[in-house]
Amino acid sequence: MPFTPAVLNKRLSDLIVHEIDPSVGYNRRDINITPAAVQLGQVVFRAKSSDLTAAYAVLSAAAQLVDTNEFAIVGGDHYSFNPSFTPRTSATGQFNAVAIVGNGNAIQLKEYFVKQVAQDADGANLTDAQFETLRGLLEAAGIQLLKTL
């Protein structure tokens, strides 16, 4: 009997453990990301701002892990869930991605994809200690990262 390779299809449920009233999407927001390759669980950041249209950038270095920045975790493009994409150039009045922003409401995520992307040598290349700093910054925003076994 031939062996068939198992393919891991990424799903939003591979990221989100618990969200208060997911049909309403309290913790999700349309955002703009400076165009760059994005994956499920990608952390993006921007300087804290009340301007909801201010663009986020992909986290690329530990130096960006400061409490004067706000963070979000990407879950899809401007249409829907998408595990891997490059955002289109943003235009006035339009957004190019959907992200989990926290909003002070508790949302629980699995750390697996977030940690995998954050510690990738092609990404932010965070150490375990730096990832724990990221975990603390996300938790302050209401995003809890739960250990993945």
Residue ranges and their predicted role:
Residues 1-149:
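Surface-exposed, low-hydrophobicity beta-strand/loop segments enriched in small/polar/acidic residues
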